[in-house]
């Protein structure tokens, strides 16, 4: 019964680490543009609502964007914005 007394760790970090926010956003942006949507409006709609219907299946964009948590995407967007617009 010793094997049942130990807590096992489960990690899915490897998949998440291989997905970069920048790559995801560019793929989603291109897919939306190719389908004739306003990419900014659609991405904002997804980030605010969490509804994947804002992102098309074209280029597998919907499943790619769902590999990241929305807060991870928002965090990276804020970091990037501040990095490029901050007065020093």
UniProtKB/Swiss-Prot annotation:
Pfam families: IreB
Highest taxon of the lineage: Bacteria
Signal peptide: none
Family: Belongs to the UPF0297 family.
Protein name, entry field: UPF0297 protein BcerKBAB4_4234
């Amino acid at each position: 019964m010793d094997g049942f007394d130990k807590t096992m760790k489960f990690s899915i970090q490897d998949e998440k680490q291989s997905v970069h926010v920048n790559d995801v956003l560019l793929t989603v942006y291109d897919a939306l543009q190719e389908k004739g949507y306003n990419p900014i409006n659609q991405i904002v709609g997804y980030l605010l609502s969490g509804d994947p219907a804002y992102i098309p299946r074209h280029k597998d964009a919907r499943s790619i964007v769902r590999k990241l948590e929305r807060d991870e995407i928002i965090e990276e967007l804020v970091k990037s914005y501040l990095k490029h617009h901050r007065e020093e």
